[in-house]
Structure formats: structure tokens, C-alpha cells
From Swiss-Prot:
Keywords: Transferase. It is an enzyme of class 2 (transferase). It comes from the Eukaryota. This is Glutathione S-transferase 3. PROSITE patterns: GST_CTER, GST_NTER. GO terms for biological process: glutathione metabolic process. Residues 1-80 form the GST N-terminal domain. Residues 87-208 form the GST C-terminal domain. Its EC number is 2.5.1.18. PANTHER family: GLUTATHIONE S TRANSFERASE D10, ISOFORM A-RELATED (PTHR43969:SF9). GO terms for molecular function: glutathione transferase activity.
Amino acid sequence: MDFYYLPLSAPCRSVIMTAKALGIELNKKLLNLFEGEHLKPEFLKINPQHTIPTLVDNGFAMWESRAIMVYLVEKYGKQNDPLYPSCPKKRALINQRLYFDMGTLWKSYADYTYPQFRENKPADPELFKKFESALEFLNIFLSQSKYAAGQTMTLADLAILASVSTFDVVQMDLSKYEHILRWYNMLKDTAPGAAENWAGCLEMKKYFKK
């Protein structure tokens, strides 16, 4: 299956880690957004929203990283796969964490940092407070269980790991978040695809410094 991606993208990295966990080989197609490759007609035919990651599986195209992660487990995972178990309550908690990562954790990071390195704007203290608030919520979640959505690793961990490792590489101070650090230190080198995730983080760091 074809996978259109950019290594520095946290959402792309979360899909790569999911594929690794499932033993799926992705046909990776680098798409350089900085050179406008996502706006070429051939890619717009695949994804008119022109976003990454984008997956094409036997002619079926989809995007949005967390939707791709769920699709991969539902189609290629084991029955009642621990990454995304069939129990409605367990799935609901995983979904909650995935949506929290997308709509609160990663969004607050992006809202705070992107204007600084994309538009050279000064840091906004109010936006930083929102980012800290998101980290505090995550710290609470991780005080209640070993992993992000229970006692075993799930898709929620892979998505949030892609986010938190990005925070780490750009030197966001996580030292006061005891439970995030415990969880992060447990997974950062051992999660499926951890090495490729970190390599992508280092690419992100280069862009962040420009």
C-alpha cells in the first residue's frame, strides 16, 4: 500500500509506528510540502484536501492519521487486537485519547509554536498556558494507568508518543510532569518504530531551528 508522508510530521510518524506494530510494509512515498508537491494534480486526484499522511490501499484512499491508524488495525490486525480492542468501553477510551491528542494536546502545541517558527512571531504567553494545560491533563490521564488508555499499549500511545517526542526534541520542558516522563521514558526507545519516529523528530528539529 502507498503511504504519502513527510518524516518530520508527527501524524505521519504515528501511522508508521502503527504499521510497524502490525507488521505491515508501507510503500513510502515522500511528499515534500515545502516544495508544493502536495498540490500537484496527480496527488489532488488522490486527496483533494492535499494533506499528509495519505494512505492508498488497493485503490482505496484515505487521510487523517488517526483514521488511518484505526483502519489498519481493523483491516490487518488480529481479532480483538490489543492496539484497538473490540470492547466498546476500551475503544471509547482509546478514541477519547486520540481526539484529545488531535484537538487539545497537539493543537495547543501547534497554536503556540507554529507562529514562532513559520511567521517569526514572538511567543504568546496565553497560548503557552493552554499548552501547559493540555500537558497537565495528559499527566493526570497517565497517573491513572500505565499506558495512555489502560494497562496495555494501544493506538492512543502511538499517537501521543509522536506528539510528545516532538515536544522533547524541540526542548519543551516536561520535567514537572512526572507521569508523562514515566510513560515517555518507557516507550520512547521501545515502541514499535521508535527509531524511525525519533529520526523524524530530528528532522523536525532542523526545520524548527530555521
